[in-house]
Amino acid sequence: MRWISRPGWPGHLLALAAGALTPLALAPFDYWPLAILSIALLYLGLRGLPGKSALWRGWWYGFGAFGAGTSWIYVSIHDYGAASVPLASLLMLGFTAGVAFFFALPAWLWARCLRRDNAPLGDALAFAALWLALELFRSWFLTGFPWLYAGYSQLQGPLAGLVPVGGVWLSSFVIALSAALLVNLPRLFPHGASLLLGLVLLLGPWAAGLYLKGHAWTHSAGEPLRVVAIQGNIAQELKWDPNQVRAQLDLYRDLSLPQQDVDLIVWPETAVPILQDMASGYLGAMGQVADEKNAALITGVPVRERLTDGKSRYFNGITVVGEGAGTYLKQKLVPFGEYVPLQDLLRGLIAFFDLPMSDFARGPADQPLLKAKGYEIAPYICYEVVYPEFAAALAAQSQVLLTVSNDTWFGTSIGPLQHLQMAQMRALESGRWMIRATNNGVTGLIDPYGRIVRQIPQFQQGILRGEVIPMQGLTPYLQYRVWPLAGLAGVLLLWALLGRQLRPQERRLFG
């Protein structure tokens, strides 16, 4: 098995296969032990490699992970971006090759500066710290791409109890640490004290996760809210067709009018497919309907801001009418879907760079939350719910979470189910109920433990009825966010860096 840790194609191909295991640990497959196996194979494959070989080993791992785990991007480019099969394949390969460097560069850094082959415990801790740093970096760099985090595999796994303590980040850290420790255990057997400490580090977090699973970190802030969520199941090719606007508005109105004994009526992202000011009469009428029901209606709608120079800016928004108030403008935009980077160069080249409603501006930071039925509601539009720190900042001010989305862009791929899993993790991290309304699925209600308690199947028109309980109190993660864990990771990485620079006789302090 030494070939695994040697330069060359056999090890690279194994890294490719190991990376491709990543999505199998996540929704919709949920074979969570594969997350540990995948990372363990990468860790083993990097052992002893020089920097350049480690860089390519990490790149092949990343290519496998993103190639398999974000294959739904091809659906968006080909099916809805009108790109030919060769062009869509080329763009998908280019994207995958680029994001694979998220793993390549840390692998190079690991080999050149941090790896300590003669200190199995310290090496495992430093590797887990580097893995956490990688996931944090991915959530920030170039607006972020926080997809395929290892920690999502533990949504309902043994580590779920740790998620309210340290978020998905803590789950990822423990998985990476466990993977490295399992690889290094045989090297610890001759050393009793080190073996004992290694077993504590390996088993302790899993035992703590099981012990805390189901612990109630938050409590009720009032009576349950009766919720109706509408899933319109509008085909994407009809979504922005001007001839279909009236039919869509009528559909959501007609599905909502009969609803009685309701507090919140929720429509999906851009359920109103025209600008808010153009739909003012319609929204005003629906607000009156909501008032008559003693309810609030919350819907996605694009928003126009007229500027003093005669130009306008456009936002992806959510607004409340009836017994509530507020309009929220989306802050985390999807590249190419909601805005086009370098648009002066790319606009007009292919249809994918000219999708409908792909010229949104970013909403301002520090917007007030939505208000409905006397409660503060944290809003997330589509992609925003996948950012743990961003979501936590809003959740800490709220009693209920709300996310609206249109995952029609991803067809029947695994993308919408991965997206749903990340939304569930936000509910678990915050200890709050979440309402999720989507155009074609999955619309559902999620409890504070990340469990779906009501849902409408994908690709069906439907009406979901249920209750959510406003919650108060802060989980440890909402209180302290990722900072304690990031600080620990920083100390571990500095420890590894210093330990590597010392002479052999001085390394015992850092071993």
UniProtKB/Swiss-Prot annotation:
Broad enzyme group: transferase
GO biological process: lipoprotein biosynthetic process
Bilayer disposition of the protein: Multi-pass membrane protein
InterPro entries: Apolipo_AcylTrfase, C-N_Hydrolase, C-N_Hydrolase_sf, LNT_N
Functional pathway: Protein modification; lipoprotein biosynthesis (N-acyl transfer)
UniProt-recorded Gene Ontology molecular function terms: N-acyltransferase activity
Subcellular location: Cell inner membrane
EC number: 2.3.1.269
Residue ranges annotated for the CN hydrolase domain, each copy included: 230-470
Transmembrane segments: 7-29, 58-78, 90-110, 125-145, 163-183, 192-212, 482-502
Region forming the signal peptide: none
Cellular component aspect of the GO annotation: plasma membrane
HAMAP family per UniProt: Lnt
Function: Catalyzes the phospholipid dependent N-acylation of the N-terminal cysteine of apolipoprotein, the last step in lipoprotein maturation.
UniProt-recorded name of the protein: Apolipoprotein N-acyltransferase
Species, as recorded: Pseudomonas aeruginosa (strain LESB58)
